[in-house]
From Swiss-Prot:
GO cellular component entries: cytoplasm; plasma membrane
Gene this chain is encoded by: dnaA
Annotated Low complexity bias: 105-121
Annotated source species: Prochlorococcus marinus (strain AS9601)
Region (Disordered): 84-121
Protein name in UniProt: Chromosomal replication initiator protein DnaA
Start and end residues of each stretch annotated as Domain III, AAA+ region: 124-340
Length: 464
């Protein structure tokens, strides 16, 4: 296989001008030249999935560009690196209109039109979650390619698209990027992003108010539905029943369904087998934790987006320290920048490292500091915090306060109980266990705890 070829290089340059950047970078750039003989251009795709998608959606576009450059008809065939024989024939090419080629006529001005689409912002699409902000690595390449394929040609081959992976790896980002890209291509598209919790609450509300007809219209009258955290359907029998019929209605109408979960369909528990079967009938793409190179690239891209300048050794330190997920990685970046900005300390590994300790407050603080900071953060009075109130906002703040006092001071459990109005040491132990349990499953709690830790760090260092 030749490393380069002037004909293919010119074709790529031509396509780069006519295709969107995500499409070009995902499908065209990775394709390698194999040979060009007797008007037959053979290209090598990274895998069978890519070669199939190129053949069905870009073959005609590539042939047209090659003809303009060569001055005669050119036929294109695709092979994959994992399969050296030619992939599927081109016999269906004439019947498969190139959806992507048709939709490229939409200019960037459609961004203004799409903002008028009632299904965009009202349905929770975060403007930051777009394809151009997603860093693709070996851990996410297949999921990214599948997401882009669905965004370009919804309701066709990968329906449903089931994206799975651990917490904070980019599932929600990819899902919402599909929605944004689809609306950019087709401003009239009805796109809806919803969490499973919201869907469940809507079903419950519909039952109570005898309004299920309106709920069904809300979820079934869409072109593209993006459903996050489907694992939370576990044990909810009536909601599962309603979702089963919603899924069927959408699928039968040709609407695209995209589902995200923290595990693949065959590992979901407490969910009806008929739903599991439907989740598995399309394509399942998983996202793994990013490797060091990808984590470094993510931090560099975030620094560029935020117009921040971080020393390379600090970026490498953060990338090497936070390995489990992207949310944690970006959170560390944000804390480092905020800490340096507020304290005036230099952006060095030595000054930032204590702040990034994920297991402790990092400096010794007083019980009064913890109580005051927790009180300020949750907007509850210190009297309420140390009272016996069982109101959820107060009890949750109290539990977090006990957890932080345990990890930020040298007080024993009974002493911590005394600081919180004379609580028994078993109450303190229970509170700490509850917070530790929630830290691994509730991103909101984890974020709250980390923010208070950071505030305690900053206050303590100001007093040094």
């Amino acid at each position: 296989m030749q490393a380069t070829n002037p004909i293919w290089a010119e074709v790529q340059q031509s396509l780069q001008k006519t295709l969107s950047k995500p499409s070009f970078e995902t499908w065209i750039r990775p394709a390698k030249f194999n040979c060009f003989e007797n008007g037959l251009l053979t290209l090598i795709a990274p895998n069978t999935f890519s070669s199939d998608w190129l053949r069905k959606n870009y073959c005609e576009t590539i042939e047209k560009a090659a003809k303009e450059i060569c001055g005669h008809d050119v036929k294109v065939v695709f092979k994959s690196e994992t399969n050296t024989s030619s992939d599927l024939s081109n016999e269906d090419k004439a019947n498969e209109k190139n959806v992507h080629h048709k939709t490229r006529s939409f200019s960037s001005n459609n961004q203004n039109n799409s903002s008028k689409n009632q299904f965009k912002n009202p349905n929770g699409l975060n403007l930051r979650y777009v394809f151009k902000r997603f860093v693709v690595g070996p851990n996410s390449r297949l999921a990214h390619a599948a997401a882009l394929a669905v965004a370009e040609s919804p309701g066709r081959e990968f329906n449903p698209l089931f994206i799975c992976g651990g917490v904070g790896l980019g599932k929600t980002h990819l899902m919402q990027a599909i929605g944004h890209y689809r609306v950019e291509i087709d401003p009239e598209a009805k796109v809806k992003y919803v969490s499973t919790e919201t869907f469940t609450n809507d079903v419950i509300s519909g039952i109570r108010r005898d309004g299920m007809t309106a709920i069904r219209d809300k979820y079934r009258n869409v072109d593209l539905i993006l459903i996050d955290d489907i694992q939370f359907l576990e044990g909810k029998e009536y909601t599962q029943e309603e979702f089963f019929h919603t899924f069927n209605a959408l699928h039968e109408s040709g609407s695209q369904i995209v589902i995200a979960s923290d595990r693949p369909p065959n590992q979901l528990s407490g969910i009806q087998e008929r739903l599991i079967s439907r989740f598995s009938m399309g394509m399942t793409a998983d996202i793994q934790p990013p490797d060091l190179e990808t984590r470094t690239a993510i931090l560099q891209k975030k620094a560029e987006q935020e117009r921040m300048s971080l020393p390379r050794d600090l970026i490498q330190f953060i990338a090497g320290r936070f390995t489990s997920n992207i949310r944690e990685l970006e959170g560390a970046f944000t804390r480092a920048v905020a800490f340096a900005s507020i304290t005036g300390l230099p952006m060095t590994v030595q000054s930032i490292a204590p702040m990034l300790d994920p297991n402790s407050v990092g400096v010794v603080v007083t019980p009064k500091q913890v109580i005051n900071k927790v009180s300020d953060f949750f907007k509850v009075s210190t009297d309420e915090l140390i009272s016996s109130s069982r109101r959820k906002p107060v009890s949750q703040a109290r539990q977090i306060g006990m957890y932080l006092m345990r990890h930020g001071t040298d007080l024993s459990l009974p002493r911590i109980g005394d600081e919180f109005g004379g609580k028994d040491h078993t109450t303190v132990m229970y509170a700490i266990e509850q917070v530790e349990k929630k830290l691994s499953i509730d991103p909101n709690i984890a974020s709250q705890v980390q923010k208070i830790r950071d505030l305690l760090q900053i206050d303590s260092r100001k007093n040094l």
